[in-house]
Amino acid sequence: MASEHQMPASKQQPASPNIAIFEQENFQGRCHELSGACPNLKDAGVDKVGSILVHSGPWVGYEQASCKGEQFVFEKGEYPRWDSWTNSRRSDSITSLRPIKVVRAPRQPLPTRQTKDSQEHKIVLYENPSFTGKKIEIIDDDVPSFHAHGYQEKVSSVRVQSGTWVGYQYPGYRGYQYLFEKGDYKDSSEFGAQHPQIQSVRRIRDMQWHQRGAYHPSN
């Protein structure tokens, strides 16, 4: 869902991260603004997170202090209540936050044999720890269902070659969220999963705009 008033990509400059946290739903109550990582929101005077407005981002929130526990990814946009940023139903608590660094791979003027691997987003997910077993490789695409692509295995290790991604426990971008920044995750504990289950994945793009959050409750 792109903003209606975007500059051409070639002229856009990445904005400094900025997020507003409201203690009540629908952007009511005391407001606290952050422009950098906060390992404990209570130490910053935030008693409760009821709604969130991301002016520039993206960001990741955590259930526990020191960026631990369940993860919640926030892109630029409005999140009026907790079920607009998650549908895992396990927790509505956010205790720490940090900005996500979105690193773009350099674009090449022409696709050649030498530059064909310079994709902006590339991730490989493996069945077993230490990058073994069956795998699914995703390049410059969002995948709402691994099963639809013929991959029905567990995901125990992940290698992010470029871009920033968020994986989900269930198809359709539902369930627990797992942030994947560039690098290697040798087993599921390294990306914060209690069980090696990921069934959908999408790219994080800092110019994306969510008017009412990433989730749309049926009620």
Curated annotation (Swiss-Prot):
UniProt-listed Gene3D superfamilies: Crystallins
Regions that span the bilayer: none
GO biological process: lens development in camera-type eye; visual perception
Pfam families from the UniProt entry: Crystall
InterPro entries attached to this UniProt entry: Beta/Gamma-Crystallin, Beta/gamma_crystallin, G_crystallin-like
Single GO MF descriptor: structural constituent of eye lens
Region (C-terminal arm), start-end ranges: 207-219
Positions of modified residues (N-acetylalanine): 2
Keywords for this protein: Acetylation, Eye lens protein, Repeat
Key word Plastid present: no
Region spans: Connecting peptide: 102-120
Signal peptide from the UniProt entry: none
Residue intervals of the Beta/gamma crystallin 'Greek key' domain: 17-56, 57-101, 121-162, 163-205
Top-level lineage group: Eukaryota
Region of interest: N-terminal arm: 2-16
Entries under PROSITE patterns matching the protein: CRYSTALLIN_BETA_GAMMA
Family classification: Belongs to the beta/gamma-crystallin family.
Assembly: Homo/heterodimer, or complexes of higher-order. The structure of beta-crystallin oligomers seems to be stabilized through interactions between the N-terminal arms.
Function (record text): Crystallins are the dominant structural components of the vertebrate eye lens.
PANTHER family per the UniProt record, alphabetical: BETA-CRYSTALLIN B2 (PTHR11818:SF11), BETA/GAMMA CRYSTALLIN (PTHR11818)
UniProt comment concerning the protein's domains: Has a two-domain beta-structure, folded into four very similar Greek key motifs.
Protein name, UniProt field: Beta-crystallin B2
Organism encoding this protein: Gallus gallus
